Structure formats: C-alpha cells, structure tokens
Amino acid sequence: MVRLPLTPAEVERGQRLGALLRRARGDRPMLDVALAAGVSPETLRKIETGRIATPAFPTIAAIADVLGLSLDELWSGVNRPAREPLAS
C-alpha cells in the first residue's frame, strides 16, 4: 500500500495535537503516561513532537483517556482554524 504524502494542513494538525497532548501531560513522566495508555514511550514522543501527524484513533483515545481529556475537547483543540492561537 502506498501512502500519500501528508498535506501541510495535516502536518499542522499533527503539530497541534502534539502540543495539546504535551500541555495536558504537564509534569507527568512520558513513560508513565505511555504505559498507562498501552503505547510505547517512543510512540508518545513522536506524537507529541508531531513526527506522527496522523496517529491511529485508538492510540489517541487511549492517551486522551489517561490524560483526562474528552475526545470532544481534543477534537476541538486540534481541528480549530489554523490562524487561531493555541490555548495555554
């Protein structure tokens, strides 16, 4: 299967997702969050840095659950217009 290159919008959305998850994780160790979500720390690191711009839904749902984020909250934070600033 050939994967199409990501669009600039998809890359930017992946970066917003990573930033949102990093903020939600706060001071919690990446290892603790990753293990609680059932993903590898490397996967979480790649998502947080935007290197995995389109992670699988179950992966994001598990991480969001561990971080106490609702999927609605996550979607609204990731899917906002590009010019809107990230919430602090």
Which residue ranges define each predicted feature?
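A short, Lys/Arg-rich alpha-helix, primarily the initiator
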Residues: 1-27, 72
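Short, charged recognition helix plus adjacent turn
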Residues: 1-6, 75-88
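DNA-binding alpha-helical recognition surfaces that contact promoter or target DNA
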Residues: 19, 23, 46, 65, ...
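Residues within the helices of the helix-turn-helix
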Residues: 22, 31-32, 61
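Short alpha-helical DNA-recognition segment
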Residues: 26-46
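Residue-level signal for the short linker/turn that defines the boundary of a DNA-recognition helix
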Residues: 27-29, 55-58
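Short, solvent-exposed alpha-helical "recognition" segments
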Residues: 51-56, 82-86
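DNA major-groove recognition helix of helix-turn-helix/homeodomain DNA-binding modules
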Residues: 58-73
